[in-house]
Amino acid sequence: MRNPDIGIDDLTALFIADTPLIDVRAPVEFTQGSLPGAVNLPILNDEERALVGTTYKQQGSEAAIKLGYEMVSGSVKQNRLQQWLDFIHQHPRAILYCFRGGKRSQITQQWLRDTGIDSPLITGGYKRARQFLISTIDRFSEHRKLLVITGPTGSGKTRLIHDISNSHPVLDIEALARHRGSAFGGMSVPQPSQIDFENHLAVNLLKLEQNNLSEPVIVEDESRHTGKVYLPDSFFHHLRNSEIIWVDEPLATRVDNIFEDYILTTPIGQAQRIRQAIPPLASTVETREILRQQARQLFDKYAGALQAISKKLGGDRFQEVSEDLENARSDFENKNEIQSNKIWIEKLVRYYYDPLYLGSLQRRRVNPCFKGSGQAVMDYLQARK
């Protein structure tokens, strides 16, 4: 008995279950945007797809299909078929899709059936699933309440959201964007494409819709852009018009938080701990040198981020913070000391982040329903349940 294909009514269950997907589109299409849970195992590579497309325009559908079969035959066909079979062997629930649920996924499905494997495909393909995900964002933004955690840079907003994630519905936008949302906030892994960001956001919202429907989803206050990706209009408008809680921590605590995130838990802090350990931590010379090189690259990255905001800082303050950063680099290289990083961090917060963030909140005329320390906010949230 054949497995039924996946219609529009089945997409909710598919995404909630993190179903493995085989995207048989060309790599160039996959890179622009794909469905969460998908691996790209194309039936046509980029060059073959382009040739088929040209033939379709010039000679019509029949000639294009004939060319496709000719190019993907013999050992080429067997290699691609084996890739699909290997993936399905590891993920028996895998589902196929192409752009519109047309020839590419249908032919893939038939070739698999010829081997005795029956894999469903998404009816309407990527295009229909993408429309479903966009509508999910719009529906969520209209019907589900948000509770927005705001506060100056270093207040520990992201950490707070992680700490309450087992007891409250939360959404971590920065994790989805793979960016901490500041000039210095790029992570070690590349950001997703805009389409991939939206698709993963939609799946997270879809999962949040399944439980605690009366309880607001807790989310960190974000600008429209987080790094190079941006929030869809409907969701950003909802975010800006939702109830707000303000995390209020003293400057010293905020500097400590930033120091932990950007120095202590990075290769800078790791390299420093290995070098100062008595007895020495078990590590190879190669490992120590890799960490040291990564630490140098991170200092270079911070210097570049500082340069990018130099005009907003102003010449004198930019020069001052730059010198503090270079002094911290020198202390790390020559003394294995990292505490001096707090000097440039503290000045960057006072000179740049506080005026920027607090000015934005004032312009928005934010009126929080609660304001207090991180612990006080956690207690307040628990009392609201």
Curated annotation (Swiss-Prot):
Self-association state and partner proteins as the record states: Monomer.
GO molecular function, one term: transferase activity, transferring alkyl or aryl (other than methyl) groups
GO terms for biological process, alphabetical: tRNA wobble uridine modification
Ranges of residues in domain Rhodanese: 15-138
Role this protein plays: Involved in the post-transcriptional modification of the uridine at the wobble position (U34) of tRNA(Lys), tRNA(Glu) and tRNA(Gln). Catalyzes the conversion of 2-thiouridine (S2U-RNA) to 2-selenouridine (Se2U-RNA). Acts in a two-step process involving geranylation of 2-thiouridine (S2U) to S-geranyl-2-thiouridine (geS2U) and subsequent selenation of the latter derivative to 2-selenouridine (Se2U) in the tRNA chain.
Gene3D superfamilies registered for this protein in UniProt: Rhodanese-like domain (3.40.250.10)
Record organism: Nitrosomonas europaea (strain ATCC 19718 / CIP 103999 / KCTC 2705 / NBRC 14298)
Pfam families per record: Rhodanese (PF00581)
The protein's name: tRNA 2-selenouridine synthase
EC annotation from Swiss-Prot or TrEMBL: 2.9.1.3
Assigned protein family: Belongs to the SelU family.
Reaction(s) this enzyme catalyzes, per UniProt: 5-methylaminomethyl-2-thiouridine(34) in tRNA + selenophosphate + (2E)-geranyl diphosphate + H2O + H(+) = 5-methylaminomethyl-2-selenouridine(34) in tRNA + (2E)-thiogeraniol + phosphate + diphosphate; 5-methylaminomethyl-2-thiouridine(34) in tRNA + (2E)-geranyl diphosphate = 5-methylaminomethyl-S-(2E)-geranyl-thiouridine(34) in tRNA + diphosphate; 5-methylaminomethyl-S-(2E)-geranyl-thiouridine(34) in tRNA + selenophosphate + H(+) = 5-methylaminomethyl-2-(Se-phospho)selenouridine(34) in tRNA + (2E)-thiogeraniol; 5-methylaminomethyl-2-(Se-phospho)selenouridine(34) in tRNA + H2O = 5-methylaminomethyl-2-selenouridine(34) in tRNA + phosphate
Keyword terms, alphabetized: Selenium, Transferase
Enzyme class: transferase
NCBIfam families according to UniProt: PRK11784.1-2, PRK11784.1-3, tRNA_sel_U_synt
HAMAP family linked to this entry: tRNA_sel_U_synth (MF_01622)
Family annotation (CDD domains): RHOD_YbbB
Active site, renumbered: 98 (s-selanylcysteine intermediate)
